[in-house]
Amino acid sequence: MFAFRSIATTVVMVAASLASASAFAHPKLVVSSPVDNATVSAPATINLSFTEKLLPSLSGAELTMTKMPGMEMPPMKVAAKAAPSADGKSLIVTPDKPLSTGTYRLHWRVVSNDTHPVKGSISFSVK
């Protein structure tokens, strides 16, 4: 009887720890469009899909143009809006104006229910 209780207690503790670990998982980038280091026609939106539902008020992105063909230039911020998708697991970034030919970097910061911020970036070029 004692051995059964010990095994049952161990099973319950392992199950609880696995459940709590998944409940506090950080969001991870699953896929982006455009993908990192891609060369694309000017996208109307940049989509970042994550493993967790995002908290919109704590998640966002900043788009920067880092290179323009034939010109030396410092990085230049590009006006864009970031909003969650309908399912809450994607961040959709919409530039205010069509993107010009050049290279861009999108820095993102997202937060899910665990409230820990996760940051990253992707780069892409517009032909």
Curated annotation (Swiss-Prot):
Cu cation 2 binds at M65, M68, M71, M76. One of its GO terms (cellular component) is periplasmic space. Cu cation 1 binds at H26, H116. Its main location: periplasm. InterPro entries: CopC-like (IPR047685), CopC/D (IPR032694), CopC_dom (IPR007348), Cu-Rt/internalin_Ig-like (IPR014755), Ig_E-set (IPR014756). It is found in: Periplasm. Residues 1-25 form the signal peptide. The keyword Cell wall biogenesis/degradation does not apply. Keywords: Copper, Metal-binding, Periplasm, Plasmid, Signal. GO terms for biological process: copper ion transport; response to copper ion. GO terms for molecular function: copper ion binding. Belongs to the CopC family. Copper-binding protein involved in copper resistance. This is Copper resistance protein C. It comes from Xanthomonas campestris pv. juglandis (Xanthomonas arboricola pv. juglandis).
